[in-house]
């Protein structure tokens, strides 16, 4: 499992391109019959990519759970959210099966021990994107279809940011301890996300970008608002955003991304926004 430590913004300002990518970028998430796990010390967020092809893959495959989590199983003191970004698949949670189509989401509450991932067609395998945060209480494991997500249209064509925010793991949808997740789709011709930029000092965030057409990229902006840096993102890459950092993006085409947050609270208005004219 890859371990990422927290960084001070003053140190970050001196990082090279490669140092920024090494500390914050997560690549190669989907490898056949493998669990790609990244543990961030920023609010203890866990990011996983799981692509079952020829076998059903347990969540803890090739992970020393006691060494990495200090528990007997991963979700003993954690909750998780999972999206399927590939072909049809399924997740079994302590024997209960959930069929997962493209864009579907599953919230898995704290306390489940046996979590396994499978694909219905090895020629078109599921790609499961998972985030997990510490939890203190068990709620209800809940399947959330893409069609039934709570949708919030935002932006417009004039500002090249017309998009739909699909809220899945959200206080208006279901209770969780601290994990929040959703999926934002940009319309054709729109390329900007999260502009004007903001920070939320009491929550960290992870983005994963996908549906990026071949030979296109997304420029993800991070850092303090007056001292920004960019990370070039390719299809299915993820990036860690500390609480002090903005997290905005601009693509060479439209794209889709999943956002995941955890931290002190779930108050979406607990943030500081910045005018583009004030940024550097």
List the model feature ranges, each with a label.
Residues 74-101, 210-235:
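A short beta-strand-loop-beta hairpin characteristic of the jelly-roll/cupin
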Residues 122-163, 258-280:
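Double-stranded beta-helix
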Residues 26-68, 162-205:
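A short glycine-rich, His/Asp/Glu-containing loop-to-beta-strand
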Residues 1-45:
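Non-cleavable N-terminal signal-anchor transmembrane helices
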Residues 52-53, 88, 214, 246, ...:
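Short, glycine-/Ser/Thr-/acidic-enriched flexible segments
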Residues 86, 90-125, 129-134:
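Acidic, low-complexity central loop/insert segments
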Residues 39, 175-238, 242-246, 251-254:
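Acidic/His-leaning functional-site neighborhoods
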Residues 100-120, 232-253, 260-262:
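Conserved metal-binding segment of the jelly-roll/cupin
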């Amino acid at each position: 499992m890859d371990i990422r430590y927290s960084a001070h913004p003053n140190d970050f300002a001196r990082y090279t391109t490669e140092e920024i990518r090494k500390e914050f970028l997560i690549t190669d998430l989907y490898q056949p019959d493998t669990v790609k796990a990244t543990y961030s010390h920023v609010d203890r967020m866990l990011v996983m990519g799981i692509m079952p092809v020829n076998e059903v893959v347990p969540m803890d495959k090739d992970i020393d759970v006691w060494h990495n989590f200090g528990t007997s199983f991963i979700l003993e003191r954690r909750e998780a959210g999972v999206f399927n970004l590939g072909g049809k698949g399924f997740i079994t949670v302590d024997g209960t099966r959930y069929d997962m189509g493209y864009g579907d989401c599953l919230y898995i509450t704290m306390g489940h021990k046996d979590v396994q991932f499978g694909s219905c067609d090895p020629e078109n395998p599921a790609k499961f994107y998972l985030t997990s945060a510490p939890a203190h209480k068990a709620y209800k494991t809940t399947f959330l279809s893409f069609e039934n997500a709570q949708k919030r249209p935002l932006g417009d064509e004039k500002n090249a940011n017309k998009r739909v925010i699909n809220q899945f793991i959200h206080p208006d949808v279901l209770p969780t301890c601290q994990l929040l997740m959703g999926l934002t789709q940009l319309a054709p011709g729109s390329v900007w996300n999260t502009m004007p930029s903001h920070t939320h000092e009491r929550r960290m965030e992870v983005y994963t970008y996908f549906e990026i057409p071949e030979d296109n990229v997304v420029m993800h902006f991070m850092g303090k608002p007056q001292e920004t840096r960019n990370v070039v993102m390719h299809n299915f890459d993820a990036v860690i955003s500390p609480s002090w950092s903005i997290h905005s993006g601009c693509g060479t085409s439209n794209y889709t991304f999943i956002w995941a947050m955890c931290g002190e609270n779930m108050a979406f208005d607990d943030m500081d926004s910045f005018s583009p004219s004030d940024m550097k």
